[in-house]
Swiss-Prot record:
Belongs to the SecA family. It is found in: Cell inner membrane; Cytoplasm. Its main location: membrane. Signal peptide: none annotated. This is Protein translocase subunit SecA 2. InterPro entries: Helicase_ATP-bd, P-loop_NTPase, SecA, SecA_DEAD, SecA_motor_DEAD, SecA_preprotein_X-link_dom, SecA_SF2_C, SecA_Wing/Scaffold. GO terms for molecular function: ATP binding; protein-exporting ATPase activity. Monomer and homodimer. Part of the essential Sec protein translocation apparatus which comprises SecA, SecYEG and auxiliary proteins SecDF-YajC and YidC. Keywords: ATP-binding, Cell inner membrane, Cell membrane, Cytoplasm, Membrane, Nucleotide-binding, Protein transport, Translocase, Translocation, Transport. One of its GO terms (biological process) is protein targeting. Its EC number is 7.4.2.8. It catalyses: ATP + H2O + cellular proteinSide 1 = ADP + phosphate + cellular proteinSide 2.
Amino acid sequence: MTNISSIPATSRSPTRVLRFLDRTLRLIASPQQRRLTRYRALADRILALDGETRALSDAALRQRADDLRHRARAGASLDALTIPTFALVREAARRTLGEAHVVEQLIGALALRDGAIAEMKTGEGKTLTATLVAALHALAGRGVHLAAPNDYLAARDADWMRPIYALLGFGVGLITPEIDDDARRAAYACDVTYGVASEFGLDFLRDHLKFCADETVQRGHGFALVDEADATLIDDAGVPLALDGPLGDQSDFYHAVDAIVAALTPEHYELDQRRRVALTDAGYDAIDHALRQAGLLKPDASLHDTASIALLHHVMQALRARTLLKRDRDYVVAHDEVVIVDAFTGRMLPGRRYDDALHQALEAKENCPIGEETRTLASITFQSYFRRYDKLAGMTGTAGDEIEEYRQIYGLDVVAIPPHRPMIRRDAQMLHRTRDEALAAVLAELEAAHAIGQPVLIGTPSIAACDRVAATLEANGWQRSRDRGPRRFAVLNAKHHADEARIIAQAGRPFAVTLATAMAGRGTDIKLGGTPFDAALQAQARGAGGLLVIGTEHHAHRRRDAQLRGRAGRQGDPGRSVVHASIDDELLRGHPAPVSAGNGPMEPATAQRLIDAAQRRREARSFDQRLALSRFDAVIERQRDALIAQRAAIRDDPAPLQLVAQLRNDTIDDLMQQFAPPQAAWDIENLDAAVRSILTLAVPIAEPGDDRAAAAIALQARIGAIADDWMAGKVHAIGEAAIGAILRRVMLALLDQLWTEQTERLEHLKRMIGDRHLPPHRLLPEFQLEAFALFELLAKEFRHEVTAHAMRLGRPS
């Protein structure tokens, strides 16, 4: 190995030695370090253009952008256009917003350009960073989608950044839930489109239910940038986006099933640590008997029959509602309505409902009015939707713990972007023996900080925990109030969503005390001194030590702890965080804790090992679940893609009668294979019935004789010829264009209907596969095999139904 002693003495000048050391360090640097070094060099080249771009007039700046646009559309690579484009966007930001991108933001944008997850800490300016890579990809004219965490932030970011884009000639669109198709189409036609992930996904689903290509609103999936990527791509990866249709009122049924399940005792079901529930043999017997008594199960039927799958499914959903979902943790009841609570952020999610009849089961449990059950017409998970983009990138404050997941599921690297100013926040944690001791420590920490005017944020993992801490504060002389003041605290949780922006805006003021559920995804920085800016208040908050973040429990994932801590110490501000947890907390259940001698918290190193083990176990389990989801989802995705391609081909086919003829011939072949195989006995009676039912033809069918193969060929040709003649007559009578338009619409409607049914079958199959006692490595192959069989059935049903509709045209019903 080369070492410094091998360099000739005459060559050992300081400059040569430094160059040698630099080359050596670059060789041994990590890939992350080498990447950042490369990005920093590019950032320096962008900054070197500062004088040149500052000298340009607004018109000249716009002309430079137009020139880059022409080069991109003529085939120039985006890599080649990066430096001049970033320099122009940086200057546009300076002129319109009064702030130019700093080096770290340029580095973050370069990571995004390369299709990575940029990990940028709270307050580092992700919104401004996004404009660089959005403008670069917009040059090609294919559209850029920026997915914000919620509607408020999407609208805020679009309006805030719009002047930058406008100066350079880029149009900005905004997708919101209430706008109509014309407005959506116009928004997607813009160079850069802001919105929330769910709206992008739902528009994709709606587009693939349209009957004409010019009715669609999206124009492709070139580049997507996902803000708070961990929430959308990791936490919500398996959340289905669904378009639903009504099934009708079934309130009495849900109440009857809930009453039966409510009567079960612990011997009737088993719960495991993964929050799964299963009926025991005694449970099946009890349910079977109760369903018969209620008249919901026929006397000669069984819960294990195929015909009873749907009924058993409703029973299991009622059992899950009763045993797994807890009020004020998973949902709240507000105004006689069950409202889901985001498990990570504590936000209420009004309008979002659990699917597959689980929400109706909850409404029955809580004796709320039961919403109409819907049938899913089309659905897609966030994971599947965002993997459709040619290029995907994301931004988040915490990605380091999911590096492998981003890589395996999305093919994305994670790049940790250095902060603009050094982090000086101090972090600590204490693990107490009981929850009461932990709450007492939280109170003592709060009292000490409040005495010197330090702003305090207390983070809790759930609404129930938030209420518990609030009760403790009130019992000790604190007053819950919207107004800030001595010994007053504001509450920010899913029950007070409307006050969220105002509460957060003032959480950094001196003496402010804010009690909140999990803060991840709130989307608003906590600025020392509060908002609007007040220099004196900021100095007072800084002098008191900056924001103090107190956690009352550790979250199941380290990333969530980091997000809460990250509220303090933004952009080099002073700050401190401490977690006062206890071995009674939900995270540590099932993890035996060593008994500590005496009073006081556990020894720090022991506590850290215990918490790390519990969090790593939860994270590994969650990762395994999401990885399994991605593999099962990939099977469904391939079927969806095949249907989408077939649907587009039908929708855009100028001569659909050729496809109808092919489907008719395939249908006749199906019937012959089933009822008149060339090497086996014929079932003439059922063949005749099928020909009459599907083809609406009366074709004399004789016994095949000795040469079945020849007879089968002849019969198939004869049936085909008669069917062709019939259709030719219909085309002549109605007109090729008219009959083609009718059958095109028939085929599209049939595909949509069959895919709706297929989606339900596949979801039921996923659950059934999971309940089977199979080795883990056999679950996916089993699902693939049975899903393929279901897809073949769908294809067969499609060609038979199309043929039947075509042959019935003009016949009396």
